[in-house]
């Protein structure tokens, strides 16, 4: 498991972020305060405060480095 901070503060960034993550089979969570949502869920993401940085938790260690490279544009 790995945790990183991301910034997806626009509709376009959210769409691109979800499109990247849906290419992977692993489980990804977004944590904002006490809320934890599925990072592949556009509706769930829009329930968060996108003006703040959000914590992405990558549950699958196998694809971890590949996923981090794919989301490098969103990392804080």
Segments (PLM) and residue ranges:
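Short glycine-enriched loop/turn motifs at secondary-structure junctions
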Residues: 1, 31, 48-52
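Amphipathic alpha-helical interaction surfaces in cytosolic regulatory modules
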Residues: 11-27, 35-50
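A structural detector for beta-sheet-dominated domains
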Residues: 7-9, 31, 59
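C-terminal structural segments of small proteins and small subunits
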Residues: 47-76
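N-terminal intrinsically disordered, cationic/polar leader segments
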Residues: 4, 18-24, 29, 36, ...
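Short glycine-/aliphatic-rich beta-strand segments at the starts of folded cytosolic domains
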Residues: 1-7
